[in-house]
Amino acid sequence: MCFNYNALQEHIEKIKESFDFVSITSIGKGWCKRSIYSLSIGEGETSVLFLADFSDTAGITSEILLTFFERLCVAYKNDLKISAVKIRSILREQKIVIVPITNPDGLEISCSDGENALCYKGLVQRAADNNFSEWISNARGVEIGKNFPYRFSDTKSIMKNSSAFGYKGPFEASELETQAIISFCKAINPKYTITLSCSGEYISCQCSKCASDCAMMTQVFKSVSGLPIKRIKPCEAYGSFGGWFSKSFSAPSFCFSVSKRSVADLKSLYDKYEELLLLSSIM
């Protein structure tokens, strides 16, 4: 069973009731009017932004981020440590912000075999050809991870029209989800970003004018996690969030990729990545 939009809302409501110091905001909506939420904790002026995978329609990266955020909240509230780090001290200096679902409509479409696509149901069924096992697009059949305004014209689009995957969209930032993430980044100006992915275990970094910082941080993350470093080919960055962010903000955009498992494996996955997530939030 996948982690769906209702489960996200229930989790957010639980956090809201338990931790009154958390800031929860809807930063935008998908085409089916499902909100894209951000959750923030901390008192500092600077922030680190974590995002769930744009193509994770099983909710694995969403669950990992929410578990991490809730652990931070408990430690902050009770003045506890995580991996020998005193969380309250860290969060007096900066904010940690998460966007636990970046493609809420895609998540629902995948989980419901297209039934929850609302007015886009017909489009979605045609685009998927009734096979939703590979669905990672939004309600208009656009793959969000290819829709960002970074060398968009050079971005390869496997599909020419709405599809379960591979269609970059009619023009750059054409999608509501893309626009919401862009506007949010401009509003909070994070010092760097970390996207969780579900495409095998590795660490990668995109940067345009901060190569030395990027290389140093990536090596530290590798030494802590034991994960290999993946070199991103220039063509792989076209249309991507990481390519857009690093170019627009002259700051690193990291990707921590996990193996694609079921949500039932959450604990073992989370335990493996907690120290890496914590370190990446305080550097």
PLM segments and residue spans:
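Short glycine- and acidic-rich boundary segments immediately preceding or forming the N-terminal edge
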Residues: M1-I36
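Conserved beta-strand scaffold positions in the cores of enzyme catalytic domains, especially
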Residues: I24, S38, I98, G141-E143, ...
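Surface-exposed patches in mature extracellular/periplasmic domains of secreted proteins
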Residues: I24-I27, D79-I87, R231-K233
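Active-site-proximal beta-strand/loop segments in catalytic clefts of secreted hydrolases
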Residues: S26-K29, L51-F54, V99-P104, K146-P149, ...
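Short beta-strand-to-loop junctions in surface cap/lid or active-site-entrance loops
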Residues: Y37-T46
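Active-site/substrate-binding loop(s) of hydrolase catalytic cores
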Residues: E45, A58-I60, L65-C207, A211-C214
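Generic beta-sheet signal
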Residues: T46-F50, I96, F254
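Metallocarboxypeptidase
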Residues: D154-M283
